[in-house]
Amino acid sequence: MAKEKFERSKPHVNIGTIGHVDHGKTTLTAAITTVLAKKGLSELRSFDSIDNAPEEKERGITINTSHVEYQTANRHYAHVDCPGHADYVKNMVTGAAQMDGAIIVCAATDGPMPQTREHILLARQVNVPRLVVFLNKCDMVDDEEMLELVEMEMRELLSFYDFDGDNTPIIRGSALGALNGVPQWEDKVMELMDAVDTWIPLPPRDIDKPFLMPVEDVFSITGRGTVATGRIEAGIIHVGDEVEILGLGEDKKSVVTGVEMFRKLLDQGEAGDNVGLLLRGIDKNEIKRGMILCKPGQVKAHSKFKAEVYILKKEEGGRHTPFHNKYRPQFYLRTMDCTGEITLPEGTEMVMPGDNVTITVELIYPVALNVGLRFAIREGGRTVGAGQITELLD
C-alpha cells in the first residue's frame, strides 16, 4: 500500500481547518488522517504530532503551522492546521499557506463563537472560495433542535459574509469519536471528505493562467541583447511570443527571442521555472528589477488599492509603537520595493503591533498589481507587516 503515496496523477488542492479555539480543529485533522489511513489513502498522524506545530518563517513572520497530507479517491490534499488563533490570522493574511478551501469546525455544544465569525470573515477577505462546515461534538448533544439551531446560525453567518449559506454542506460528526474508531463517526469523516471533494473547487493551475514573470535581474549579452531573469509566476512563454514590460512608469513591448534555463536553450518556459528571457530591441537600462513581463493586455499598472494586512508585534521583530493615518512605509510587491501612503479605515485612529486591519494604499508610482497579490510592508529594511490586495481602486 505504501507505494501509492508518490502517485501525483490526482489533482492537488490546498485546504485547512479553521474555527474557534478548542472546537476540535486539530482533533478533526488527526481523525481525517486516521480514517483515511484505514482505507490506505493517508499516513496516520497523531493528535500530538499535529498539535506540536513547527515554527515557520514566512516573509519574516514566525507562524506555527502543521502541514498534513492525505488523499481521497479523487484528489490529493495538503492540509494546514494552526495551534493558535494568532497563527491563523497571520497564516491567512500573509498567505503563508494558500487555501483553495477550508473546513470550518464548530462545536455543536457551543455554536458559533467569536473566532468562528472572525475566521469566516478572514476567509472572505482573503478570497477562500468555499467552506465546508463540520459540526463537531455531536455525540455530546442529545437535542436534535439544538443541532438544527446551530446549523441555522452557521448558515446565517456564512450568508452574512457572502458565502453560499444555503448550499454549503454541513456535516454533523464527532472528531474524537472518529479518532477512537467508532464506526458511526468514522462514516461522518468520510462524508466530510466527500463534501470537500465535491464542494471545494479545483484551483486554476498557474500554468493555465496568462504569462507573467517578475524581473529579478537584468544583464546584456554582447551581440545578442538584453536578458531579464526571474521565476515565471504564471503561464507559459514560447520563443517568438510578444511580451509587455510593465512598471516604473513607462510600459514597453518586446518579443522574446530566447528562453534559457540552467544555461540551456529551451523552446518554452512555464510557471515555476527560473529562466532568462532574451528580449528583442530592449536596452539594458530600459528594464530593471521590480518590473514585470507579461502577456500583452493582461495586467495593468495600478497605484491605489485596498488590502488586508497583519502588523507584526514587537516580539516578532515588528514596530514597538502603533502607526497612524498617512504612515508611509515601503511595500515589497513581487520583486519591487515602492513607497506608499496608508489610509486607515474611518474611525480607526491608529494600528497597534499585532493587529490585522483593512487599509487603503496609494503608491508613489504605478506598479503591476492584481487582486490576491501578497506583499510585505517594510520600514528601514525590516518587515513590519504583510498582507494581500483585496481590491484595486484605480
Curated annotation (Swiss-Prot):
Residue numbers spanned by region G5: 174-176
Region spans: G3: 81-84
PROSITE patterns linked to this entry: G_TR_1 (PS00301), G_TR_2 (PS51722)
Positions of GTP binding: 19-26, 81-85, 136-139
Annotated segments matching region G1: 19-26
One of the record's GO molecular function terms: translation elongation factor activity
Reaction catalysis annotation: GTP + H2O = GDP + phosphate + H(+)
Keywords from the named record: Cytoplasm, Elongation factor, GTP-binding, Hydrolase, Magnesium, Metal-binding, Nucleotide-binding, Protein biosynthesis
One Pfam entry name: GTP_EFTU
Taxonomic superkingdom: Bacteria
Region (G4) residue spans: 136-139
Annotated segments matching region G2: 60-64
Record-linked CDD domains: EF_Tu, EFTU_II, EFTU_III
Enzyme Commission numbers on file: 3.6.5.3
GO cellular component: cytosol
Residue positions binding Mg(2+): T26
Key word Nucleotide-binding present: yes
Domain tr-type G: residue ranges: 10-205
HAMAP family named in the record: EF_Tu_B (MF_00118_B)
Protein family according to the UniProt entry: Belongs to the TRAFAC class translation factor GTPase superfamily. Classic translation factor GTPase family. EF-Tu/EF-1A subfamily.
Function: GTP hydrolase that promotes the GTP-dependent binding of aminoacyl-tRNA to the A-site of ribosomes during protein biosynthesis.
Subunit text: Monomer.
Name of protein: Elongation factor Tu
Species the sequence originates in: Phocaeicola vulgatus (strain ATCC 8482 / DSM 1447 / JCM 5826 / CCUG 4940 / NBRC 14291 / NCTC 11154)
Taxonomic placement: Bacteria, Pseudomonadati, Bacteroidota, Bacteroidia, Bacteroidales
